């Protein structure tokens, strides 16, 4: 059911435990390139820790997201979760996404945060549960970094609704040119990857909502075959067309 995640599986560079202090130069270079496999290999080799990586992304969000409005909420447990993945790695864990921060479109339920679909009507909608997709990401070792902005109700409003605008998050901006569209409805997931707020994000698509933001922001994103990824606990539009899928900077990472 989740076979698309196999594309994200990371080949570890070594089997050595983490013993080296954070190399900020290497970390910054890898964040800029955004390749999930390279980042995972560096984590496995002890070039830096998941804690340092997570804090680096959180610092970027704090510094730049006021302009881009890609992020709706940060997981308050993200740094602690990163520390746990460092401990797991030192104990020999080889989970495929171990210690990789991932951002989640805010129409997908996560236990730590409300799921709003960008709408004021759902602003306090905290269900305290994970969608099966999120449970699979956690099982693979991913760190849920936070939730991303989107076209409100995933654009299930009108043909003239603004791409990337929601009453909760405002207007998402395209980091490459804030005057151009970020497209939608997975606008925040796309803008977040383009701004290097995480190496991997999850969007959803009914008709173009992953591929369009990926296209206009220089990313790779794809819509898996409907039914391959569980639709459970994702705010619905169409049972025959809805699916979640990955968005990243390159083919290897997506």
Segments (PLM) and residue ranges:
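Hydrophobic alpha-helical membrane context
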Residues: 15, 117-118, 217
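Gly/Ser-rich catalytic/binding loops embedded in alpha/beta enzyme cores
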Residues: 22-207, 225
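Fold-level recognition of mixed alpha/beta catalytic cores in primary-metabolism enzymes, strongest
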Residues: 159, 163-166, 190-254
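Bacterial N-terminal signal peptides
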Residues: 4-15
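Short, flexible, solvent-exposed loop/turn segments with mixed acidic/basic and small polar residues
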Residues: 4, 58-60, 233-236
């Amino acid at each position: 059911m989740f076979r698309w995640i196999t594309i994200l599986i990371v080949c570890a560079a070594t089997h050595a435990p983490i013993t080296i202090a954070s190399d900020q130069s290497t970390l910054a270079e890898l964040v800029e390139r955004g390749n999930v496999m390279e980042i995972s290999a560096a984590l496995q080799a002890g070039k830096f820790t998941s804690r340092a990586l997570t804090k680096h992304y959180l610092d970027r969000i704090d510094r730049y997201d006021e302009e881009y409005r890609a992020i709706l909420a940060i997981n308050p447990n993200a740094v602690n979760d990163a520390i746990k993945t460092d401990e797991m790695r030192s104990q020999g864990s080889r989970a495929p996404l171990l210690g990789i921060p991932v951002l989640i479109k805010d129409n997908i339920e996560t236990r730590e945060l409300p799921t709003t679909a960008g709408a004021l009507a759902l602003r306090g909608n905290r269900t305290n549960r994970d969608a099966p997709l999120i449970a699979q990401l956690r099982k693979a070792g991913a760190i849920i970094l936070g939730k991303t902005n989107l076209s409100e109700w995933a654009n299930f409003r009108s043909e003239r609704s603004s791409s990337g605008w929601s009453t909760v998050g405002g207007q998402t901006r395209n980091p490459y040119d804030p005057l151009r569209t970020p497209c939608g409805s997975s606008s925040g997931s796309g803008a977040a990857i383009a701004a290097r707020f995480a190496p991997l994000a999850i969007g959803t698509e009914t008709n173009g909502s992953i591929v369009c933001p990926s296209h206009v922001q220089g990313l790779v994103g794809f819509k898996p075959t409907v039914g391959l990824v569980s639709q459970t606990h994702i705010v619905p539009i169409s049972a025959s067309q809805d699916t979640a899928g990955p968005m990243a900077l390159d083919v290897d990472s997506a």
